């Protein structure tokens, strides 16, 4: 995350204080004052004046901001991002135990693991979880020609997701059956394992090869580009625990409608305008409508799955971060099991 091009480093005492300020604010929803912090006794051994000065420093570097309703301070958007990145505890042992128990000795695919984990976490912790996938990462695994009659044939396509697609192809006068068979054979040789999002480009690149073997190659080429390989990139989202975001008190109803529409149909990862550093893999956005998004991508073979947590600005970020990390851990464990099973089968 790019903290407005600032290198923010807090010493231990200040880190403890700032962490407690944020967590108190998230728990109470109220501005935090120095007197209240002294009364809480976090073992800082500081007077109200000293804590007030430290809070003023936090304000100067943009981590805190003044509240409009009291003399206390509240975390800024920058402060909340800093907390999530560096201070929110992403290790929830209780949640981890519950999930381990749930998945013990269950044979699930990686996709099933992600969906069940997201659903379970939303129920256990009370978070709104969103899982997303798009077909642009799917690849062509098989293409077959089936002749119905002299005027019509069917092209059967199998994608890496297991999805089978049948498309009719009209046998125009300019398209000879033998030429069509040659074209399909070339496509099998050259396009298998190509991403669906790249099929148009890769098919056009075969023009010189088709030209050598097929008389009316342009008609066949256009037929496949326009009618057969016309895959639209689509986003599929599953939302779990939707009621949790609906019941958030600090999000206005008119904003909620827009948020629900967004999380049901859009890539949250792509929605978040955040500069991600190479070593980071969680995006966070604190939005003007008082909602917050945390999103993570997980690579699974030839596709990317996206997992997100959606809540109010005052949601429990530690649990949200923990949820994302736990799902990634479960996926990694599932990968190891699948690899072990494949090796056993080979023996």
Swiss-Prot record:
GO terms for biological process: negative regulation of DNA-templated transcription. GO terms for molecular function: DNA binding. SUPFAM superfamilies: GAF domain-like (SSF55781), Winged helix' DNA-binding domain (SSF46785). It holds the Pfam family HrcA. InterPro entries: HrcA (IPR002571), HrcA_C (IPR021153), WH-like_DNA-bd_sf (IPR036388), WH_DNA-bd_sf (IPR036390). Keywords: Repressor, Stress response, Transcription, Transcription regulation. PANTHER family: HEAT-INDUCIBLE TRANSCRIPTION REPRESSOR HRCA. Negative regulator of class I heat shock genes (grpE-dnaK-dnaJ and groELS operons). Prevents heat-shock induction of these operons. NCBIfam families: hrcA. Belongs to the HrcA family. This is Heat-inducible transcription repressor HrcA. The gene is hrcA.
């Amino acid at each position: 995350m790019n903290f407005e091009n600032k290198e923010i480093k807090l010493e231990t005492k200040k880190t403890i204080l700032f962490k407690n300020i944020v967590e108190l604010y998230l728990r109470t929803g109220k501005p935090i004052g120095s007197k209240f912090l002294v009364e809480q006794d976090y073992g800082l051994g500081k007077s109200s004046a000293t804590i007030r000065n430290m809070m003023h420093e936090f304000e100067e570097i943009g981590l805190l901001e003044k509240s409009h309703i009291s003399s206390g301070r509240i975390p800024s958007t920058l402060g909340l991002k800093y907390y999530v990145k560096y201070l929110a505890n992403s290790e929830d042992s209780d949640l981890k135990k519950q999930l381990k128990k749930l998945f013990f000795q269950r044979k699930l695919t990686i996709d099933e693991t992600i969906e069940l984990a997201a659903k379970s976490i939303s129920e256990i912790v009370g978070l709104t979880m969103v899982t997303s996938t798009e077909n642009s990462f799917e690849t062509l695994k098989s293409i077959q020609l089936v002749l119905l009659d002299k005027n019509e044939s069917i092209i059967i396509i199998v994608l890496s997701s297991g999805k089978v697609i049948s498309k009719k192809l009209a046998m125009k006068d300019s398209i000879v059956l033998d030429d069509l068979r040659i074209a399909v054979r070339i496509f099998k040789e050259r396009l298998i394992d190509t991403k669906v999002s790249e099929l148009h480009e890769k098919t056009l690149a075969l023009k010189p090869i088709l030209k050598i073997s097929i008389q009316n190659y342009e008609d066949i080429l256009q037929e496949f580009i326009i009618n057969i390989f016309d895959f639209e990139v689509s986003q599929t989202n599953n939302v779990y625990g939707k009621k949790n975001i609906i019941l958030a008190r600090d999000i206005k109803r008119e904003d909620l409608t827009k948020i629900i529409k967004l999380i049901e149909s859009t890539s949250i990862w792509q929605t978040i305008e955040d500069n991600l550093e190479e070593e980071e893999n969680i995006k966070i956005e604190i939005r003007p409508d008082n909602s917050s998004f945390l999103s993570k991508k997980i690579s699974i073979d030839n596709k990317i799955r996206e997992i997100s947590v959606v809540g109010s600005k005052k949601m429990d970020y530690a649990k949200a971060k923990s949820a994302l990390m736990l799902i990634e851990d479960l996926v990694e464990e599932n990968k190891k099991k699948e690899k072990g099973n494949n090796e056993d089968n080979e023996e």
